A protein has these predicted regions:
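Phosphate/nucleotide-binding beta-alpha loop and adjacent structural elements of enzyme active sites
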Residues: 1-264
Length: 264
């Protein structure tokens, strides 16, 4: 998007770097709101996103307290009991705690009244419907909306909320295998074509994991080059020491012979 100083909202922000869909925006100078109830990931977000508004809360239909099923060190934590049960059966460790739930419209009322919302992402592992219906899309109009559209950790579609989103004057543009993408009708002419197809071979994109491996390789190669240089310097120093030692030994031998000749 050709937008400078843009504003985003990331509901279910999770890790601020790994697999984050808003990291690139932040790196370009954007800022926004991150909602993440997990203590582990909330700390990471606060450290990595000092310009953002970071809220350790969940989003839902109405204000209140809700049971949160946290699955440590994963992006699978959820407020949906059924989803948590499936993860527990699959062998994941599930920790339960109460968290504060706030409707997304209230969050926007408090923090986004003076901002044009350019991008809204919702990824809450099975509770997307509650988050979306807690938003006032007539008052607050994100240009682009991205919502996780499959059952957690699967490729099975789960989009019961889709008709409601479309009823809020949003056009569906594409499914990338994980998320549904929408554009506000009033922005369709500007952005609809750009979001007609997912990232593909013609984009020349590189997966984040490949970038990370490349960076790790480059760092190791640099370290190896430094170690090789140090080793070469040590070899040169050893050679110099040997030469000095040999010269000293020769001088000592010559002096000894001279002394012997004099004594004779």
């Amino acid at each position: 998007m050709d937008v400078k100083d843009g504003f985003y909202i990331d509901v279910g922000a999770n890790d601020p770097i790994e697999m984050s869909v808003t990291k690139w925006f932040y790196d370009q100078g954007w800022h926004g709101i991150n909602m993440e109830p997990s203590e582990e990931y909330f700390r990471k977000i606060c450290e990595a996103r000092p310009r953002d508004i970071n809220l350790q809360q969940g989003a839902g239909k109405k204000r209140g307290q809700l049971k949160f099923y946290e699955i440590p060190e994963t992006g699978l934590s959820t407020t949906d009991g059924e989803t948590a049960s499936r993860h527990r059966t699959a062998g994941f460790r599930v920790e339960e705690k109460e968290i504060e739930i706030v409707p997304l419209k209230d969050v926007c009322e408090a923090y986004a009244q003076e901002h044009e919302i350019h991008f809204l992402k919702v990824d809450v592992e099975g509770s997307e419907s509650d988050v979306l219906t807690g938003m006032d899309f007539q008052r607050f109009r994100p240009w682009i909306l991205v919502v996780e559209a499959t059952l957690p950790n699967s490729t099975v579609l789960s989009v019961d909320w889709d008709p409601w989103v479309r009823s809020q004057d949003y056009d569906f543009t594409l499914f990338d295998g994980l998320n549904y993408y929408y554009v506000a009708k009033e922005r369709a002419q500007a952005f609809g074509a750009r979001l007609a197809v997912p990232a593909n071979i013609f984009d020349g994109f590189v997966q984040a994991s490949t970038v990370q491996l490349t960076q790790q390789r480059d760092a190791l190669e640099q370290k190896l080059a430094q170690m090789t240089q140090t080793l070469e310097q040590m070899r040169e120093e050893m050679k110099r020491c040997r030469e000095e030692c040999d010269e000293t030994q020769m001088n000592d031998t010559g002096a000894f012979r001279l002394k012997g000749a004099i004594l004779e």
